[in-house]
Amino acid sequence: MSRIIGRKGINYIHRLNSASFTSVSASSIEKGQNRVIDASLTLIRERAKLKGELVRLLGGAKASTSLLGVPLGHNSSFLQGPAFAPPRIREAIWCGSTNSATEEGKELKDPRVLTDVGDVPVQEIRDCGVDDDRLMNVISESVKLVMEEEPLRPLVLGGDHSISYPVVRAVSEKLGGPVDILHLDAHPDIYDCFEGNKYSHASSFARIMEGGYARRLLQVGIRSINQEGREQGKRFGVEQYEMRTFSKDRPMLENLKLGEGVKGVYISIDVDCLDPAFAPGVSHIEPGGLSFRDVLNILHNLQADVVGADVVEFNPQRDTVDGMTAMVAAKLVRELAAKISK
């Protein structure tokens, strides 16, 4: 089903051709696609330039977090609601029920801590028949546009977990070398090619590791893993910390030091790393997960230069009426912004 939906844009173009545009050549369609992609990148480029200039004029920031939304859900193997997450997370970040300071006292209203460059228009691009190979390149290029405007660093709002591959690829290529990755998730997302989709949200870290974009990959919160997940972990030298041993691993995981000898550390948080008691609004509910304070302890105590991050797999269509998981995702974003900015 996901592969059929994944080709929706291409099928849409085919229907147009058969119905009323039979004389439109493939090259003309490609030129049109290129115009849409160029326009999409131009908007992100100009917004990043504006936000970067603002932060530089204010001065005093060595690193500043900039939000980039990637509302992509078609690579999910189950539900596609994560495509609707970025606006809900933004709404929750600025919800009047809480203040705009992080736990460590950083003020989110200060552009040196947090800016926003908008969303990659995923559905608009796909509606023009753009395939996933090109779409992944657009996402990577968008991340690089943010990073070109120093001191901005990307904090990406998913979307399903397939977005981590093009984002990490962009961060690694832009910095000129691999990073260490701290990945919090109920699942390892390291299938070689899940259900025939190499870009599946269940395969993102296989693409990252085989591309050489990460030196170390630490996966924390794992509690849904099969034989292939373990074999792939061994193949790539992944450090997998399962929930069944978390009480034993906790002292080490709450005092991590990462990134020495590489270009920095990337943090990827799948909201389903949390126990569903804390975050019910996810596509793949897995009981027995981390508490929210477990996650914050890991983040707050981490010794690292965090060069990028993502928060993925929040599904607003499964959230509670009062938007509890949206607030949870927003809190993760707020604390990640504090960790990145300096």
Swiss-Prot record:
Observed effect of gene inactivation: Increased formation of lateral and adventitious roots and increased production of NO in roots.
Matching Pfam families: Arginase
Manner of cofactor binding, per the entry note: Binds 2 manganese ions per subunit.
Pathway: Nitrogen metabolism; urea cycle; L-ornithine and urea from L-arginine: step 1/1; Amine and polyamine biosynthesis; putrescine biosynthesis via agmatine pathway; putrescine from agmatine: step 1/1
Positions with a binding annotation for Mn(2+) 1: 161, 185, 189, 270
Subcellular location per the Swiss-Prot or TrEMBL entry: Mitochondrion
Keywords per UniProt: Arginine metabolism, Hydrolase, Manganese, Metal-binding, Mitochondrion, Putrescine biosynthesis, Transit peptide
Keyword presence, Lyase: no
Coiled coil (residue ranges): none
Catalytic activity: L-arginine + H2O = urea + L-ornithine; agmatine + H2O = urea + putrescine
Residues annotated to bind L-ornithine: 77, 96-99, 189-191, 224
Family: Belongs to the arginase family.
Subunit structure: Forms homohexamers.
UniProt function note: Catalyzes the hydrolysis of L-arginine to urea and L-ornithine. The latter can be utilized in the urea cycle or as a precursor for the synthesis of both polyamines and proline. Possesses agmatinase activity. Catalyzes the formation of putrescine from agmatine.
Protein name stated in the entry: Arginase 1, mitochondrial
Gene expressing this chain: ARGAH1
